Every structure is written in C-alpha cells, then in structure tokens.
Amino acid sequence: MTDLLGDMRRTHTCGELRVTDVDTEVTLMGWVQRRRDHGGVIFIDFRDKEGITQIVFNPEVNPEVHAKAQTIRSEYVLGVKGRVVNRPDDMVNPKMVTGGIEILVDELKILSRAETPAFQIEDRIEASETVRLKYRHLDLRRPKLQQNIIARHTASRAVRDYLNDLGFLDIETPFLTRSTPEGARDYLVPSRVNHGQFYALPQSPQLFKQMLMISGFDRYYQIVRCFRDEDLRADRQPEFTQIDMEMSFVGEDEIMEITEGLIKTVFKRVRDIDLELPFQRITYAESIDRFGIDRPDMRFGLELNDLSDLVENTGFKVFASVVKKGGLVKAINAKGCANFTRKQIDELTDFAAIYKAKGLAWVKVKADGTWQSPIAKFFTDDEKKAIEVRLDMEKDDIVFFVADNPKITNEALGQLRNELARRLELIDNNTYRFVWVTHFPLVEYDEGEKRYQAIHHPFTAPLEEDLEKLDTDPLNVRSRAYDMVLNGIEIGGGSIRIHSTELQEKVLNTLGIGKEEANDKFGFLLNALGSGTPPHGGLAFGFDRLVMLLCQEESIRDVIAFPKTQRATCLLTEAPSKAAPAQLQELSIRVVNIEE
C-alpha cells in the first residue's frame, strides 16, 4: 500500500537548499534517483525537475522511518520531512549545487511505488531512441530533456513578451480549413456533417494572417501548430510549431529589424548570449556563388571559386566540355590538407556522388610547389598559374573540383564544403552565426510536372524591377523573399506579399493556375485583395529548430515533449491507430487494402 498525501505540502524543491538553510525544517517531494546503504544508514539521491538533494535515513534518529525506507527502490515517489544539516567534510560534493547539505529525514510517505524502469533515468543513457520514445514519460524525467523543455517554455515567454511590447496581437487562426497547394501533402480530416468533404489541417496560417492584415490588424503573431504530411528528417515533424508574424505598411528592412530584435531577446533570455545586430545579409545569387547552397554555414571559410572562365579552353576535356555546354567548374581549396590519404579522397568522392556529382577531381600542391594529381598533365603552366592565383593555392593544399551543370556543381560542392568542415573540425559549436539570404528566385521549373512552381509560396511578391520578366522570363524573376539562416540551418523565412488582385492572378497564372482553379482554391483571397489591402509582409520561424539550436541538440525530437518518429508514429500512444467500424460508417468511409 502507498501513503496518502494528506496535508503534507512541499516547502522547497530539490535544487534550492544550501548551507545557509542548515537547521531549517523542510518538506521535499520527488523521485528516488538512486539509493545507497552505508553501515545501516540509507542515503538517497532525491530528484525533481529543479535538481537533486541527498536525503538520509538514520536508524538512530527514527528507527520506524528507517525501516520503512528499506523498502524504497528507484523511481519511487516520496514525500519527506526533515532537517537540513551540513554534510560531513569528506562527503561534500562540490559538483552539486546542493552538495554541501543533506536532509535528515524524520517523516516519510511513499506516495507511489514504481516497477523497475526500462532504463536508468540519467543523461548518459544507453537505451535506443525507440525505447526512449516508447517510454517517453520516463525519458522526460532525465535532467537534460527537462532542461530542454524548460528552455522551450522560456523561449516561448520571451517571444510573447517581446512582440506584445511592440503592439503585436496574438490572434488564433483555424485548424480546420481547406486544402491549398503549399508544397507538401495535407493532413485531411473528413467531415461527418458534410459527407464526402474534407477539412485540411493547415501547413501554415499564411492566408489567414493575410486576411487579418486586410481586416486592419496591422501587427499579428501566433506560436502555432502546423501540419505537413511529408517524409521526415532529423529536423522535421508531421506536426510542428512555428512563430508566425505579419505586419502591414512595412518593407523588408523593418521586418528584418524587428525579427532580429526578437531573436536577440530569445538568445539573451534562454542562454544569456548577447548577439550582435544587425545580422549579415547576402543575396541568394551570392550565397549560391560563394557557398553552393542557399543556407550557408558562416562559421568557417572554404568558399567555392568559379574556374569556368579559366578552363573553358583547357586540354582537360572533362572541364572544357562542361563549360561549353553551359555548365560550371568550381573548386574548394582545403588549406594545408595535402596529407589526405587516397582512402579519404575516395570517401569524399563517394560523398559528392550522393549529390549527383559524376566525379571529384583533386590536386595536391607538393612542397616544391608542383601539382600532384591525375589531371595535372592536362594543364599548361599558364593555366596552372591562373588557377593557383584564383584559389590562393600554396604548398600542402589540396583542391577539389566538380564540373557539371550549375545545380549539381553548386549543390555537390556546397555539401562537400560542410563535410570538409566537419572532418577538419573547423566548426565551433559554441558560435552562433546568423545570415539573411534575400532575393530568392520567384519560381523554379518542375520537370516532372512540366510547369513552374513557387520557391516559397504563390503569395510572395516579385521585385518591382523584375515584373516585366514575369511573362517572358519567369525563371529570372527575383522575389521579395528572405530566409534567416543560423549555422547552416534555415530557421525562418518570409516575404513581402502580393497585395494586388491583378498581380496575384498574374503570378498564379505563371504557376499554371488558371482563373477557374484560382477562384476555386483562392477565391476568398482574391476577393479580399480587392477590398482595400495594405502592403504587408511577415515571416515564420521554425520554433522547434530554433530551440534545438539553443539547446545544442542534434534533433528536434529532443526539444519536443511528445514527438513522432521518422515514420510519423507515436510510440507512446501507438498512434496512428485503426478507427472503429462505427466511426468509419459515420464518416461514410470505407478502408480499402491496397497491395504494395
């Protein structure tokens, strides 16, 4: 049998008592971390989310309580009363904030017993993630995870405080809405009342926040759940949280300034880190040119260099033919790394192949300044000199080359840049480098669909100076979109929106969405745009990713209380599950087994 709580109430947490509290009578409640018996005296590390305090059961102080304590096991929930005393000098633990004291217990209540846990409740855990997620209620007792969840709460409060002070309104938008094309699959919810019709869970509140701007609420925000039925990675979840913002009568500069202040506030509140403002800004074109990708990690160099103009007439036909076909030849100089072995080079070649590179050429600069490489013989001395100057090549350097169409060349070398930085330990994990990437292309061409698709979403405004290209050269139309990138991870993105019905219809038409389809899917927006729409824009931060980086975790699953697996399942509750036949009948749904 367990004890009832009765009128026992906690006076302190397990992380707050110090030597200044000696001789104080206290009541603590929490979990048994571990138990030790020494010469008949029982010592217990007693834990709650605030910390650990050592409690002591001495048979000479209270034999009855001591006898009861002998039944205690790990993860039992206890309530204890006792007196704070100094630890003996040889038992002081300077690694614990409570390490100078212990509680001499004279009253004990066993509030709940526990079976042997599936794993030890410690930060150094050997259990697999599958086991941890199945027993998430135990996993969440670990100090590190509890600190992450508390940091998430602190970040959320900081966001609300900052935006409230700037006159933003926290306005809720619907979860049951209609399906719109936003790049990923929607989660559909069948309507019981309207048979054969479905709601969609929102991938973002995009259209509703634009409606709020049209309605006159000129500063809006939400910390809101969003849903996307997509293939998952370490930084993706089917349901995720974003900080969603929108403002009227603003341009890019004002939005960036406000959001930089928001991020500065969050970092100060959660990590006591003072960020320098403003953040660096580069265009999309510059990011691709220098780093190969649109989410560059700015904590290290290893920038890409374009050699196409130097090799278009070289004797090395692999390079020359690529340039003549409109491709690119680019290179990275890994300074001082000519000691790379053949095995290491082969590993990097295989890595580049993941991103469709057909090969990875390389050149080592020997101590005498000459080239060591299978391709060295194809270049004249003048060509070598020009390449050396362009790449700042010196003895003991190794240079890696990729030659292919622009997309493959940039992507493969951009990812290789990150891989080299990891291997060479160039990344300082205690450094936070932010950069805005601006002026993204408005659209890209989807070869499978044989039509243009919006890079961000269909409501992003084009740059005014590129409007005339919308009909004739849409791939070269730049947008008023911007992403915030932190340490190579996109944590937020937004844009100035289209606030003209005519321009919105024109952009939709460019995307292959004719008037009839546009009215069917976006008629409410198009009608609203004609009601007097202020210029407006905003952005959304991936809150889970932001907290992941703040907590220096590798996966957002470690900063979400109850995350899904990479197969979008909840191992704790075994969701998703089959619906009862009666439920399906109410919804007029029949499940058909499809053989894969």
From Swiss-Prot:
One of its GO terms (molecular function) is ATP binding. It is found in: Cytoplasm. One of its GO terms (biological process) is aspartyl-tRNA aminoacylation. Coiled coil: none annotated. L-aspartate binds at E182, R228, H456, R497. The record marks H38 as: Important for tRNA non-discrimination. GO terms for cellular component: cytoplasm. Residues 206-209 are annotated as: Aspartate. Signal peptide: none annotated. Aspartyl-tRNA synthetase with relaxed tRNA specificity since it is able to aspartylate not only its cognate tRNA(Asp) but also tRNA(Asn). Reaction proceeds in two steps: L-aspartate is first activated by ATP to form Asp-AMP and then transferred to the acceptor end of tRNA(Asp/Asn). Belongs to the class-II aminoacyl-tRNA synthetase family. Type 1 subfamily. This is Aspartate--tRNA(Asp/Asn) ligase. It comes from Desulforapulum autotrophicum (strain ATCC 43914 / DSM 3382 / VKM B-1955 / HRM2) (Desulfobacterium autotrophicum). The lineage of its organism: Bacteria, Pseudomonadati, Thermodesulfobacteriota, Desulfobacteria, Desulfobacterales. The gene is aspS.
